[in-house]
Amino acid sequence: MNPQIRNPMERMYRDTFYDNFENEPILYGRSYTWLCYEVKIKRGRSNLLWDTGVFRGQVYFKPQYHAEMCFLSWFCGNQLPAYKCFQITWFVSWTPCPDCVAKLAEFLSEHPNVTLTISAARLYYYWERDYRRALCRLSQAGARVTIMDYEEFAYCWENFVYNEGQQFMPWYKFDENYAFLHRTLKEILRYLMDPDTFTFNFNNDPLVLRRRQTYLCYEVERLDNGTWVLMDQHMGFLCNEAKNLLCGFYGRHAELRFLDLVPSLQLDPAQIYRVTWFISWSPCFSWGCAGEVRAFLQENTHVRLRIFAARIYDYDPLYKEALQMLRDAGAQVSIMTYDEFEYCWDTFVYRQGCPFQPWDGLEEHSQALSGRLRAILQNQGN
């Protein structure tokens, strides 16, 4: 193997950067993928820069020659301690191919002490189903995937290019290309959930086992002249964030992750919004989810909340109290019926045209759970 491919470079030349990082959505004649990286070590609330560099990968060769795999080989070869938490940022000329995504998902699963952010100049074969699904899988594995904006191009120019003191100059249609790629990526990642993930975790049989993860599909609507208007850019999918005790992180439930997301939605206090959650488990009490949601609704009176739950936590009086707390805060809490399951399948699942197939007992379980929830909210539950 060419050692230049396996070992990182410090920087690239100006022409190389302009030629390979141009954000034209469809670009031919580029036989290399370029990857600029930063690795930081998390220390409390700050991050210490550990290393930076550039990898060049060959596009049309076997996956082990791709830039992403060169980085993983180099990173793992350093035998870094598992008790330290690392924050990796990539600036890449193309998003990873499906083979590289599979390896990246495996790497992230085996290294809970690592977070990965990938900012790409272009989307690789974004019109092909397998490549779109690979991006969904990458995001579902925990990687943050974005499109490079002007600030990130300028940052790469300053830190990874022999720029000879010159400033970064964007090319023709730079903003137009970015807008298209950003919109396309958001559309791809909207359909984040794998079909098997949905059917496994949203099964509403109260006796199902091994469903400890909470999945939350959300959408936001704005009230316009008495009509709720869906905001397509504010739809998505979240799940619990895994704990990492080595880094002192105890995890975060999907409901709290949504509340963390709200500031980025930039909801105008002068407007009225309705947030809808389709959630595999009703919000819990022990992690403070119900209390945090109540506080959010009290502080944001311009936001309405509807919660459709596949199953409810009601085995403990405190969990029943959590449901009552949400009701008292103004949230509308209901059990998912066939209509909600089908809507989630059509809206939030990468279903490839397949219609929703209900599982045995769906309607019976929904009716029974609705009765239990109604008793709790009417203070009739034990």
UniProtKB/Swiss-Prot annotation:
Record-linked InterPro entries = APOBEC/CMP_deaminase_Zn-bd, APOBEC_Cyt_Deaminase, CMP_dCMP_dom, Cytidine_deaminase-like
Database matches in PROSITE patterns: CYT_DCMP_DEAMINASES_1, CYT_DCMP_DEAMINASES_2
Compartment list: Nucleus
Catalytic reactions of this protein: a 2'-deoxycytidine in single-stranded DNA + H2O + H(+) = a 2'-deoxyuridine in single-stranded DNA + NH4(+)
Named cofactor requirement(s) = Zn(2+)
Tell me where it mainly resides: nucleus
The EC category is hydrolase
Q: Which GO terms describe its cellular component?
A: cytoplasm; nucleoplasm; nucleus; P-body
EC number, as in UniProt:
3.5.4.38
Alphabetic keyword roster: Antiviral defense, Hydrolase, Immunity, Innate immunity, Metal-binding, Nucleus, Repeat, RNA-binding, Zinc
Tell me, what's a Pfam family for it?
NAD2
Q: Which residues form the active site?
A: 255
A GO term for molecular function: zinc ion binding
Q: Which domain of life is it from?
A: Eukaryota
Q: In which tissues is it expressed?
A: Expressed at high and moderate levels in peripheral blood leukocytes, spleen, testes, heart, thymus, prostate and ovary. Also expressed at low levels in several other tissues.
* CMP/dCMP-type deaminase domain residues: 29-138, 210-326
Biological process (GO) annotations held by this record are: clearance of foreign intracellular DNA; cytidine to uridine editing; defense response to virus; DNA cytosine deamination; innate immune response; negative regulation of single stranded viral RNA replication via double stranded DNA intermediate; transposable element silencing
Q: What induces it?
A: Phorbol 12-myristate 13-acetate (PMA) induces overexpression in keratinocytes. Up-regulated by IFN-alpha.
Further notes on this entry?
Answer: It is one of seven related genes or pseudogenes found in a cluster, thought to result from gene duplication, on chromosome 22.
Quaternary form? Homodimer. Interacts with APOBEC3G. Does not interact with APOBEC1.
Indicate the family of this protein: Belongs to the cytidine and deoxycytidylate deaminase family.
PANTHER family, sorted = DNA DC-DU-EDITING ENZYME APOBEC-3A-RELATED, MRNA EDITING ENZYME
Function statement? DNA deaminase (cytidine deaminase) which acts as an inhibitor of retrovirus replication and retrotransposon mobility via deaminase-dependent and -independent mechanisms. After the penetration of retroviral nucleocapsids into target cells of infection and the initiation of reverse transcription, it can induce the conversion of cytosine to uracil in the minus-sense single-strand viral DNA, leading to G-to-A hypermutations in the subsequent plus-strand viral DNA.
Domain topic, free-text comment: The CMP/dCMP deaminase domain 1 mediates RNA binding, RNA-dependent oligomerization and virion incorporation whereas the CMP/dCMP deaminase domain 2 confers deoxycytidine deaminase activity and substrate sequence specificity.
The entry's protein name is: DNA dC->dU-editing enzyme APOBEC-3B
Species this chain originates from = Homo sapiens (Human)
Q: Which gene encodes it?
A: APOBEC3B
